[in-house]
Each structure stands twice: as structure tokens, then as C-alpha cells.
């Protein structure tokens, strides 16, 4: 036990804080007091994740209904699938078998894939907060995965090496800089368990890459570098599609076996800064000026 303790990170729901976590800490301290252990605390870090919730449904007799028994009609009303009777929609609560507000993950995976489910759950809210499961959310995640795959189809596999930034079109050079910025942002977010922020940075980055004009000087290598990096950054969150992206781009071996990308701090320095414009103490707008501009 002295070799393996303390555990680096404990992850558990709020119910663990008054059961397993309490017992684990108590027995560890007791064993330390008795001289059997060298550590008093069994865990270095604690992270408590939120719960997944869903709307609750009742039929006309007050019995609970599961989500797959309910349909929203054209008028926006919830009705029973079997007889079309009105269904009462209750507030979103933690998924439980007693209230039948659970969603079968097998059906979701069969329809949208595991990556879409992972992406939706990670992007919907900070992991320490509760989240509500919605069909629109999982569909949005699925559409984004399809967009990522289309980006691979539009990326040249024989683009050649990156040129120096001063030999590229400005827009292509900006994508290279955006790639290094995304590496820094996503890395920091993942290390801090801010998975929703990591997804937001990945989406922002992919939007920028998608807008790059393929005809610009240096755009081909810049896009390939960006899309390869995008796959690497998204791999912990969406492992299945990013492995396919990596293979389609000609990557060697499994993406999961590759080293995590590192950023160049020099490329994170902004060429311009945004200044607020005030008139008589009231903000009237903003202007972008060169970072080295004279006062």
C-alpha cells in the first residue's frame, strides 16, 4: 500500500463523498495511526462530477413512462406512443430506474456512435455540474463529427512540409499560429478537467481551419498540419473518429500511441491588440492596433 498510495486522482459522484470517500479516508488514517501506513490521506486530488438528468414523464393515470414511450407531436405536445394520450412532462431529474427517465446507451451508440455520446456529455456543461440529456444535443454532436470527417476529405495528403511563416499567405500563417494556440488551450483545459472548455476550443479551431482558402500560398501544408493536430487534440475526447482521421491522413500507427503535441510559445504572441475606445467615460467601440505601435 505504501508503494501505491496516495492515489493521484479520485473521481466520484457526490454520493461517494459521504460513503466510500469517507470510509477510505477514515481507514487510511487509522492504519497510519497504527503504524501500518506511511500516508494519512489516500488521495492527492478529488474531483466530483455532476449527474446526468432527463425530463420525467407520466401518463394520464400518473404512472411513470420512459423517454422511448413518448413522442412530441407537431403541435409540440408530449403524447404516448401507443394510444396518443396526453403525457405530463415533469422537470429534469437525475436519471433513475424508479422514474424511468433513463436512456439506453446501446440505442444511442447504434444510432449515433459512442463518440457522439461522449462529445455531447463532455461539451454540454462543466463536468462538476449536472447536465440534461437531450435528443437535440446528441444530434448536434453527431453533425459535428460528420463535419470533422468532411474536413479530412478536403485535406491534401501530399501537401508537403510547412514553409516558414513569412513565405506563406497571411491567412495560412494565421492557421499555423491558431494551431499552436489550440494546442496550448486544449492542453491546459484537459489538465484542469475543463472538458467543456476543451471541446469549445476544438470547435473554434476547426471553424477557423474550415474557412481557410485552399488556393492561398502555403494553405495546403498549413491545413494538413492543422487537421492532423486537430485529430490529436480531440483524440482523448473522441477516440474512434480521430483514429480514423489519423489513418486517412496517412499517420503512422495508432494515434493513441503518438506523443501529445507541444506548442511554440513564440507563435502565441499576438501581432495586434484590441483597445477599448471611450468618449466621456462611455465605451463607444474597440479598435485593433499593432502590438508594437507607438502610443
Each model region followed by its residue ranges:
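Glycine-rich, small/acidic residue-mixed loop/short-helix segments
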Residues: 289-295
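Helix-rich, typically C-terminal accessory recognition domains appended to large enzymatic cores
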Residues: 22, 26, 36-42, 107-288
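Generic "edge-of-domain/loop-turn" microfeature
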Residues: 53, 282-284, 294
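Hydrophobic/anchoring residues in structured secondary elements
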Residues: 48, 288-289
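Structured ligand/cofactor/substrate-binding pocket environments in proteins
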Residues: 2-86, 90-118, 131-152, 224-235
Amino acid at each position: 500500500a505504501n508503494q501505491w498510495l496516495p492515489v493521484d486522482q479520485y473521481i466520484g459522484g457526490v454520493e461517494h463523498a459521504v460513503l466510500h470517500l469517507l470510509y477510505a479516508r477514515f481507514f487510511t488514517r487509522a492504519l497510519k495511526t497504527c503504524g501500518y501506513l506511511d500516508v494519512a490521506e489516500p488521495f492527492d486530488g478529488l474531483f466530483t462530477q455532476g449527474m446526468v438528468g432527463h425530463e420525467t414523464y407520466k401518463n394520464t393515470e400518473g404512472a411513470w413512462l420512459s423517454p422511448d414511450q413518448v413522442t412530441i407531436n407537431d403541435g409540440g405536445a408530449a403524447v404516448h406512443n401507443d394510444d396518443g394520450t396526453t403525457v405530463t412532462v415533469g422537470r429534469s431529474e437525475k436519471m433513475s430506474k424508479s422514474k424511468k427517465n433513463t436512456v439506453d446507451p446501446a440505442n444511442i451508440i447504434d444510432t449515433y456512435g459512442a463518440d457522439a455520446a461522449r462529445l455531447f456529455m463532455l461539451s454540454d456543461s462543466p463536468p462538476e455540474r449536472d447536465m440534461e440529456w437531450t435528443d437535440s444535443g446528441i444530434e448536434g454532436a453527431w453533425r459535428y463529427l460528420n463535419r470533422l470527417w468532411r474536413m479530412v476529405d478536403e485535406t491534401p495528403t501530399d501537401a508537403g512540409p510547412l514553409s516558414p511563416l513569412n513565405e506563406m499567405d497571411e491567412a495560412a500563417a494565421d492557421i499555423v499560429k491558431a494551431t499552436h494556440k489550440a494546442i496550448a488551450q486544449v492542453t491546459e483545459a484537459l489538465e484542469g478537467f475543463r472538458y467543456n472548455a476543451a471541446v469549445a476550443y476544438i470547435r473554434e479551431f476547426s471553424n477557423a481551419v474550415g474557412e481557410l482558402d485552399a488556393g492561398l500560398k502555403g494553405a495546403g501544408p498549413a491545413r494538413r498540419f492543422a487537421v492532423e493536430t486537430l485529430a490529436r487534440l480531440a483524440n482523448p475526447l473522441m477516440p474512434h473518429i480521430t483514429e480514423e482521421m489519423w489513418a486517412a491522413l496517412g499517420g503512422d500507427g495508432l494515434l493513441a500511441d503518438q506523443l501529445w503535441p507541444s506548442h511554440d510559445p513564440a507563435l502565441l504572441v499576438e501581432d495586434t491588440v484590441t483597445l477599448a475606445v471611450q468618449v466621456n467615460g462611455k465605451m463607444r467601440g474597440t479598435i485593433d492596433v499593432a502590438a508594437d505601435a507607438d502610443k
